Amino acid sequence: MDFQALLSQLPQETLFVLLAYGAVLGTYLIAVPLALYAWINLRWYRMSKFERLGVYGLVFLFFPGMIVFAPFINLRLSGQGEV
């Protein structure tokens, strides 16, 4: 049984629910954590204490998505060059 035949057998309400779950899951695990990584990298040295508190709260909230991308993103400092 191919994928198209499987989709045609499901009721339309079920497809809407699956699409909604996929959108929420994609937002929670992919979109927001990547945007948060970009924001942290851009503003790391210029954040106020309240902005930093808010960012840390968002990191706590979106921790599962942050863990998904942690092995692939390197935000360490560049260092002093050749020593």
UniProtKB/Swiss-Prot annotation:
Q: Which residues cross the membrane?
A: 15-35, 53-73
Per its UniProt record, what InterPro entries does this chain match? NADH-quinone_OxRdatse_su_L
Q: Does the keyword Endoplasmic reticulum apply?
A: no
Arranged from A to Z, the UniProt key words for this protein are: Membrane, NAD, NADP, Plastoquinone, Quinone, Thylakoid, Translocase, Transmembrane, Transmembrane helix, Transport
Do the record's keywords include Aminoacyl-tRNA synthetase? no
* GO molecular function (one): quinone binding
Intracellular or extracellular location(s):
Cellular thylakoid membrane
Superkingdom, according to UniProt? Bacteria
Query: So what EC number does this one have?
Result: 7.1.1.-
UniProt membrane topology term = Multi-pass membrane protein
User: How is this protein organized at the quaternary level?
Assistant: NDH-1 can be composed of about 15 different subunits; different subcomplexes with different compositions have been identified which probably have different functions.
The similarity comment for this entry is: Belongs to the complex I NdhL subunit family.
Q: What role is this protein assigned?
A: NDH-1 shuttles electrons from an unknown electron donor, via FMN and iron-sulfur (Fe-S) centers, to quinones in the respiratory and/or the photosynthetic chain. The immediate electron acceptor for the enzyme in this species is believed to be plastoquinone. Couples the redox reaction to proton translocation, and thus conserves the redox energy in a proton gradient. Cyanobacterial NDH-1 also plays a role in inorganic carbon-concentration.
Q: What is this protein called?
A: NAD(P)H-quinone oxidoreductase subunit L
Q: Which organism is it from?
A: Synechococcus sp. (strain CC9902)
Organism lineage reads as: Bacteria, Bacillati, Cyanobacteriota, Cyanophyceae, Synechococcales
